[in-house]
């Protein structure tokens, strides 16, 4: 009788654990459904910012008695245009991807995480390069006898400054997306159990001293 009772208690505990896991899964699914519109809007926000920054930079040109200057004359500004275009396309694609309900898997979470990282660093590098160009345009560089240019081409510099500021707004959005995708990836999926590593476990190389 005691053995039968023990088996019954074990079966009841397993059933309770299974029910608890189902409740947790249902709760996670409800949270995911509620958070999907918010994440979709967050992923669409860089699209607006990147298109605005790219448009301003593409139209940035000034002519006066000293000559003509355009964004295409400076490599850093051209890089900013290309980076904003690529990030705008990714923002649109990721917003559509997030808006469509689909089961979350480890592989999909990894893909989204890696793409978020790549485009975050891409737009950050573009903003930093353009900001450095603006600094030189406003202040010059006495060590290499570069004079400042914004005193002559003030309108060009002001429009470029607005474009760079909007780009850093997009950078902030991509940083938030990177944090979100990394949290989803590393909190929802646990490390593989020791049995999945094989009978030998993890082998660590030993180097001679």
From Swiss-Prot:
What is one Pfam family matched by this protein? CASP_dom
User: How does this protein sit in the membrane?
Assistant: Multi-pass membrane protein
Q: Which UniProt keywords apply?
A: Cell membrane, Membrane, Transmembrane, Transmembrane helix
TM segment ranges: 38-58, 80-100, 110-130, 162-182
The residue spans the entry assigns to the Extracellular side of the membrane are as follows 59-79, 131-161
What is the annotated localization of this protein? Cell membrane
> Which InterPro entries does its entry note?
CASP/CASPL, CASP_dom
Mind telling me which GO cellular component terms the entry cites?
A: plasma membrane
Just give the chief location class.
membrane
For the Cytoplasmic compartment, the record's topological domain ranges are 1-37, 101-109, 183-209
Family to which the UniProt record says this protein belongs: Belongs to the Casparian strip membrane proteins (CASP) family.
Concerning NCBIfam families, the annotation shows:
A_tha_TIGR01569
Q: How does it assemble?
A: Homodimer and heterodimers.
The protein here is known as CASP-like protein 2A2
